[in-house]
Amino acid sequence: MAPPLSSKVYVDGVYIPAALIVIGTAIVKRDWVVYSVALALALGTWKFFQLKPKKVLDPTKFQEFELKEKTIISHNVAIYRIQLPSPSSILGLPIGQHISIGADIPQPDGSSKEVVRSYTPISGDEQPGYVDLLIKSYPTGNISKYMAGLSVGQSIRVRGPKGAFVYQPNMVRHFGMIAGGTGITPMLQVVRAIVRGRAAGDTTQVDLIFANVTKEDILLKEDLDALAAEDKGFRVHYVLDRPPEGWTGGVGFVTQDMITKWLPKPADDVKILLCGPPPMVSGLKKATEALGFKKARPVSKLEDQVFAF
């Protein structure tokens, strides 16, 4: 998706330089203004096409990009902003797919081993020039610990796109989503595409169950609440294992009763999306099957009624 014509990249790169050419000519030699306008239009057109978004991802090889910013969210969660080659660069990542991060991880015997993990960005192509990743560090997570140890200015190896799911408008009547922890990232991408990319006649409904341990663990809550307020076709239902006093949302693990209460019933035009810790996803596959949804495969395919990222 291209940035809007009112974005800073066009203001600084096209409009201001063109205006300076015309104004400067009018001050120095008014008779030449018509020529300066023609020159400004020609240069502006050339610059406009130069600034058109350029996709940088390559699924066949890793590329190195610079870590531009690291924003600490909590003791084990951070947002990593990766700078792309130019202000007009975009990943070109299909909605619902992810990128791979690779690194050489030291081994106990002194050797190193390439480890690769997949992450879904929380930013989109409408924000050119960079990509944001939300990553939670785990004690046994090789790549998450590697990312946590990086300093701004160091490089990150990126490859992609990757994944079997690609969102298309009106692909189903109703999405039911269940996410746990950082499993919210692919859901956010799909929800944002539905809410902010609705065409006339698109009536896609979305219900999301988002499970976490405590209220403080709820990632991207402001973004989710803003999307729910923006579009009555999207509803989010929070579930906490250790809720605070006065909590009115769900409590404990996600149960069949919660799925029945908040998510759509099985139908050919309904799709359930799952993302979270493996034990959670495994349990949810069994729960959805027990409720009448088609049995989820070990490795999901786009056409599956229950799809696990």
Curated annotation (Swiss-Prot):
E.C. number(s) listed in UniProt: 1.6.2.2
Example GO biological process: protein histidyl modification to diphthamide
Pathway: Protein modification; peptidyl-diphthamide biosynthesis
CDD domains: cyt_b5_reduct_like
Role this protein plays: NADH-dependent reductase for DPH3 and cytochrome b5. Required for the first step of diphthamide biosynthesis, a post-translational modification of histidine which occurs in elongation factor 2. DPH1 and DPH2 transfer a 3-amino-3-carboxypropyl (ACP) group from S-adenosyl-L-methionine (SAM) to a histidine residue, the reaction is assisted by a reduction system comprising DPH3 and a NADH-dependent reductase, predominantly CBR1. By reducing DPH3, also involved in the formation of the tRNA wobble base modification mcm5s 2U (5-methoxycarbonylmethyl-2-thiouridine), mediated by the elongator complex.
Family the UniProt entry places it in: Belongs to the flavoprotein pyridine nucleotide cytochrome reductase family.
Name by which UniProt lists this protein: NADH-cytochrome b5 reductase 1
Phylogenetic classification of the source organism: Eukaryota, Fungi, Dikarya, Ascomycota, Pezizomycotina
